Amino acid sequence: LEEKGDKQIYTCGHSLGGAMSGIAASRLDGAICYNYGCPRIGTNSWRKAFDKEHKMYRFVNDRDIVPRIPPRWMRYKHAGELHFIDKNGNIKKNPNPLRQLGIGLCNMCKNPLRIAQGIPDHNMGDYHRFVENWCNKK
């Protein structure tokens, strides 16, 4: 890696692999990270340091449960730029966080067991299909 010259380094991963790609990118000068369904990786200070030096494109599919762990009360944060995939497969860059919170709370109040419905949204095949469709539209 020291001899990479002017070549750009990219890291990517899904789920825990996404967390590992973020940690790897944080240790590589100028690395760009793409992750899909990634859990929260670090503290607020880690996130700020990462965002200052690196780029991360974080994709979250609708109700995917993994990006919601560890819980916020444990003070873990997401780094990078959120690309949210809604239930219709549309991708929105950095959607309004209050709206996202409202949707989540509303879903939990309607059906507390609905959190289990986030498990199928973690499927990497869905991420691949939605992101590929989005790229083909551009």
Predicted segments, located by residue:
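Non-catalytic, mobile gating and regulatory segments of ester bond hydrolases
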Residues: L1-C12, L16-K138
